[in-house]
């Protein structure tokens, strides 16, 4: 049985956004469709994995429950909730309309040293690669000869029979995890 909202908020308090320099902050961006948060369990799992990795002293009992913290409204047909959190708790929750980016062209960029295993608010490494897109809409990031991700999304490529996703993406995306569990995509080494 999960704790009540008061316990969630007292043990892992929500604060107003403060000076964020020099703090490790992480983010979950959750799709809101017809007023309902989507794939909340996948976001919860990734957030808990991040907290356990970076802030192990906090323990499972102090982790916030996204389903209790999010309060989407019925009029939110196609929105996103951006939850920023760190060692001191959930620092902000913002809602905004979601707009799909149209991608028509891709630029391959290589970086053999990039790491982005956790969804951090510090996207400097990804932004530096995205800046190399030239006249293209987005980049495909290659590390050690293998396709990994774009600057904003995981990759899925159709080979005429199967949808394939990189075996070693930069970030384990929630949609990617869902599609793998449903066996709608398969992992492969993509070159």
Map each language-model feature to its residues:
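Conserved alpha/beta cores of soluble small-molecule-handling proteins
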Residues: 2-4, 8, 12-146, 162, ...
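A cytosolic small-molecule/anion-sensing beta-strand core signal
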Residues: 143, 151, 159
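Short beta-strand/strand-turn micro-motif
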Residues: 148-154
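A short acidic/small-residue loop/turn micro-motif
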Residues: 155-156, 171
């Amino acid at each position: 049985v999960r704790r009540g909202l008061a316990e969630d908020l007292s043990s892992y308090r929500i604060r107003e956004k403060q000076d964020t320099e020099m703090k490790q902050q992480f983010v979950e961006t959750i799709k809101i469709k017809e007023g309902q948060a989507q794939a909340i369990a996948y976001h919860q799992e990734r957030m808990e994995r991040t907290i356990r990795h970076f802030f192990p002293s906090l323990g499972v009992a102090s982790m916030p429950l996204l389903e209790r913290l999010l309060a989407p409204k019925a009029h939110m047909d196609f929105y996103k909730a951006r939850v920023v959190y760190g060692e001191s708790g959930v620092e902000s929750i913002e809602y905004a309309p979601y707009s799909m980016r149209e991608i028509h062209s891709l630029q391959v960029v290589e970086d053999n040293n990039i790491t982005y295993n956790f969804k951090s608010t510090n996207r400097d490494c990804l932004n530096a690669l995205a800046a190399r897109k030239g006249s293209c809409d987005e980049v495909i990031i290659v590390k050690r000869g293998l396709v990994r991700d774009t600057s904003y999304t995981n990759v899925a490529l159709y080979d005429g029979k199967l949808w394939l996703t990189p075996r070693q993406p930069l970030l384990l995306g929630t949609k990617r995890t869902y599609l793998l569990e449903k066996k709608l995509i398969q992992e492969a080494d993509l070159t």
